[in-house]
Amino acid sequence: MGYHSTSETASNTADFLVRLKDFLVGTVGWTLRDDRSGDAEPSYVLASPGESGAEDIFLRFVNDSAVDRIAVRAYLYWDAATHTGVKEAFHTSYTYIKTVDASAFLYWIYADMDHVFIVTKIAAVYYAHYCGLLKRF
């Protein structure tokens, strides 16, 4: 499958998180593995078998509204029954999507079953984020 894309305006971080989940699940074909939208820090875990159908991609998007961003984590596997991931990756202060809670912001999403690339525009500054498969050598 080819890339899908969208560009819209989100009213805040919470709105963007839902729009991101809806786009990846409804348009691109990712699976909602775990819905933690009722938590103090709402999150969604999305899963994909990749473009090849042989991958295991688990991405968790967490509304880290205390600092105007969505934290992104990757896992080797996600257990939806216990709400826990195995072999967490991307757990640093640099793996996030920059957002803002105080005002609306523009965003662009480009994605397929392997990759997710997001650009947000906060005031006059553009922020980019990539997550998904890394190129194998």
State the predicted function of each range.
Residues 4-137:
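Long, leucine/valine-rich, helix-dominated scaffolding and oligomerization segments
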